Amino acid sequence: MSEQRSDEPEVVDAIIEDQQGAQATTDATPPVRIENSLPTELVIYPLGGRPFFPGMLTPIQVEGSPYYETIKKAMDSHGRLFGILASHAEDGQEVFDANQLFGIGTVVRILEASVNEEAKQIKLLAEGLWRFEVRDVVSVGPPIVAQVTHHNNPVSVVDTDALKPYTMAVINTLKEILKYDSLYQEQVKMFLSRHNFSEPDRLADFVASMTSSSREELQEVLETLPIMARLEKVLTLLKKELEVVKLQNKIQRQVEEGIAEHQRQFFLREQLKEIQKELGITKDDRTAEIDRFRERLEKLTLSEEAEQKIEEELDKLAILETGSSEYGVTRNYVDWLTSLPWGVHSTDKLNIARARRILDRDHDGLEDVKERILEFLAVGKLKGEIGGSIILLVGPPGVGKTSIGRSVATAVGREFYRFSVGGMRDEAEIKGHRRTYVGAMPGKFVQAIKHTKVANPLIMLDEVDKIGASYQGDPASALLEVLDPEQNSEFLDHYMDVRFDLSKVLFICTANQLDTIPRPLLDRMEVIRLSGYITSEKVRIARNHLLPKQLEKNGLDKSQLRVSNGALREIIEGYAREAGVRRLEQKIGAIARKVAVKVLEEAELPISVGQNDLDSYLGKPDFREEKPLTGVGIVTGLAWTALGGATLDIESAQTSTEGNTLLLTGQLGDVMKESARIAFSFLQSNVEKLGGKSERLKGNIHLHVPEGATPKDGPSAGITIATALLSLARTQPLPRRLAMTGEITLTGSVLAVGGVREKVIAARRVGIRELIIPEACRKDYDEVPEHIREGFTVHFVKKYAEVAKLVFG
């Protein structure tokens, strides 16, 4: 309970005396009564906020039209009377609209007034007299004038006796409130100076006006004319006020106790410092470290759990021997706890135009990926935050997954931290080691938070498709908590042993393929695919990004080395035939290093590198323009690997007419072997219908996929294998160069396959312009950018019979 003011007993005694029937003090002013006839019309002043009650004595200041004219007219009226009505307006504004005013208000007398005509300002002291009710509006004004009925009948002595239980209940409740809050005492003193508690009507109005009740509740009291009903309503409001005051008192006491304890500790520490200073005692290492930890805490917004844990550890640190091993463990633990940016967040810069400029500056091509990232940022702008989504960038090596993550961090103004989970086999790398182990440390995510010094960085997890598992745990399972927006707000690192909120962190993961990512982990991510680049895009990337980067890296400038577009195109097609641009950058770097030697040998500048000069800089091309394999039983298929799209030649031959075996070579996986057997069975059943000779598929059949050192798997070569076998059965080569992809069933249906975009890019890279694709993949093909699809003739098929007709007629 808060301390009562020294004059509180005087007020409480006055209340008790009134309860016993004592009259007010001799200097109390009796209620005002106007003896002459009451006016039937009153000037109305609309009052915003709380209603004005009879018995109230309040200063009012009015300024400007129409308030000034209203009060001036009231000052000129008989008895200097006017009426105050509360307003219906939701914002509590004073409105000069009769329809916006309540019907019952208070007659007010002007006791004193000070008029400033130049400023149109009046300061007056107003006294509430009695209630009135509007019968009709004479003038809508302003000022508003209304015909009124006065309610000013005094309460009889008989009524006073009947109301005594109600008045005592009100007085007792008021007395309780005074014990908890002394601010009400001044209002009670002012009331006792003019009235006494033996007037139940005045008591009810006074008590209602001093509560913090709503405008509607107070207006209801004002409109209640029977005094007994009015006292009942006032008692209800007073009981509510008592509960509010008790709660406020409790909260204030708790706050004061907390502040007092904090101040006490502060003063004791300051006194200890002064004593040590006077005695010439310098701080030991332990005291200096504890002070340093406490200085860090002043800048942080700790959770209750963290604050309690840190205080416990600091108290423990203060009593441990500095030479003990436990002291070192505890010191390191407190150092980590106080180094984390509790409650420190950077401000997101969610400017879509700026983000688009940064993405376009850092990356050529990838338009669909940029649009998806901009959509993600736009949603974050509308929501006010961009946490809660986990982005997974999937694509071949070298297409710019990591650099896109950096660009996103720059675009939104967040700190960037990257680490690779490829090959990670220990769960403790994610969730930390328990402090009982020697050399224990927090996991990667806590380290990232400490390194970036903010609680909302952008963290990139590279190579999530290559995460491992061992007897030490499964890191992929540990990632489930981190990458789940519903759980990561209470992430618990084993070392920290205190929950830290990771929900504001923006996570971006990268992978080369989805097949090896655990399904529960993949379900938490939003996949954005990055396909490989076509030659024209690579030339632009090399010109705008890779070449300037390698010039700077090797100490050159553009006045010393010039590389033609023809040379860049030849590098791409002859030396760096890949989905990404990493090997392309390596080749440009090799040229730059050789040019650096020539510059120092004082060669004539600038040194120009054309298409015909590449042999002297890079040696013979790694890839030659090979003639496509042609002949009976040979078909080109389309494949999709972790490195991007690729073309795949399939060869078939009848090795003998004896026996009945299908030999498969070329390091094929189980799924591809099954697909080959299905295609072979389908052809054996339908070869005559498709124009082939069944005897050509009897005996021993050998099916080979070249580049035997490269593992191959998947069902997408089904129709390619079937076509190679049909070519063998018809003894007819393919009449033109085309490529195909699609899974085949025993009934000859052609099913959907994945990686359509990557396969189309692979076909363009080797010059194939006619494709056969499953009808079920039409939507995937339509999503391939227009500049990649340009020049292609594509056939969509549902049945293998359509494939045979397209190929052989």
From Swiss-Prot:
Chemical reaction(s) catalysed: Hydrolysis of proteins in presence of ATP
Domain (Lon proteolytic) spans 629-809
Per its UniProt record, what InterPro entries does this chain match? AAA+_ATPase, ATPase_AAA_core, Lon_bac, Lon_bac/euk-typ, Lon_lid, Lon_proteolytic, Lon_Prtase, Lon_prtase_N
- Which amino acid positions bind ATP, per UniProt? G395, P396, P397, G398, V399, G400, K401, T402
Q: Which Pfam families match?
A: AAA, Lon_C, Lon_lid, LON_substr_bdg
Task: Please indicate if the UniProt record lists Zinc-finger as a keyword.
Answer: no
EC number annotated for this UniProt entry: 3.4.21.53
The alphabetical list of record keywords is: ATP-binding, Cytoplasm, Hydrolase, Nucleotide-binding, Protease, Serine protease, Stress response
Its annotated compartments are: Cytoplasm
NCBIfam families, sorted: lon (TIGR00763)
What is the role of this chain?
ATP-dependent serine protease that mediates the selective degradation of mutant and abnormal proteins as well as certain short-lived regulatory proteins. Required for cellular homeostasis and for survival from DNA damage and developmental changes induced by stress. Degrades polypeptides processively to yield small peptide fragments that are 5 to 10 amino acids long. Binds to DNA in a double-stranded, site-specific manner.
The record's comment on protein family reads: Belongs to the peptidase S16 family.
Q: What is this protein called?
A: Lon protease
Q: Which organism is it from?
A: Magnetococcus marinus (strain ATCC BAA-1437 / JCM 17883 / MC-1)
Taxonomic lineage of the native organism:
Bacteria, Pseudomonadati, Pseudomonadota, Alphaproteobacteria, Magnetococcales
